[in-house]
Amino acid sequence: MPSNPCRPGSDTTAAPAAVFPSAAPNWRRLDYLAQGNERQRSAHALLSGGLWDELGPLCNDLALVSTIAIGLDRPGSDLDILCQHPDPAFLAATLAAQGWQVRSKDEQVWIAEQRRHGPDGQCWPVELYLTPDPLEMCHGWRHLSLMAALLERFGAPFHREVLRLRFDEGLKGEAAMCRLLGLSGDPYEALLTLEGVNLAGLCCPSLPHPLDEQGHRPCPHPGGTLLP
């Protein structure tokens, strides 16, 4: 299969103790990790030190969609990688022959897992999602893009609260953000309701928000109300 044609660029956006691609995030990139926090730099060393080149010829497309990409990972977090291939079962068999632990998630998606040591000695659990779908359509890509946009929208206080919920209560990133935003139901589905929403007008009830001219905090998310 042809290798991933997308090569790293240079555009980065600062985030608390981390960096991630700015507007229209391209999760195929790795370069921004080298400029991030210690764990991001460690992940970059592993991925760019051979794993990306190892997987590239096997897949049509690759993207890192782990929370480490936006600085919301915890110790032990996986490096989640989307791998596009027209025949995921064939790719799974190829990876199994190379020592990966593989299993079927459904008829179209396979999972491959392995622990890898980077050049810095750090051991990372790596999880590959083998899919025939374009990567931008995958929930992992869509969730990460929304979470990055929300971090940019609400800044450091939001980032700190998400991390607090991740560490103190063990919540996934999606669940932590949905709690802070007051989104009910399945957090994986609830987060996707923000696709296409103008986040500039979105409020986070858990964070201070400037009052409008009527003394309310605007909360224009569909179904939301003006909060006194």
Range-by-range predicted roles:
Residues 33, 68-77, 192, 201, ...:
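Long, low-complexity, intrinsically disordered polar/charged segments
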Residues 91-99:
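Short amphipathic alpha-helices in soluble, non-transmembrane regions
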Residues 100-135:
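Conserved catalytic core of two-metal-ion nucleotidyltransferases
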Residues 93-94, 129, 139-142:
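A short secondary-structure junction signal
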Residues 89-91, 134-136:
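Residue-level signal for secondary-structure boundary sites
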Residues 136-228:
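Catalytic cores of NTP-dependent nucleotidyl/adenyl transfer enzymes across multiple folds
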Residues 51-90:
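Active-site nucleotide-donor binding segment shared across nucleotidyl transfer reactions
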Residues 2-64, 222-228:
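Helical scaffold of the NTase/Pol beta-like nucleotidyltransferase catalytic core
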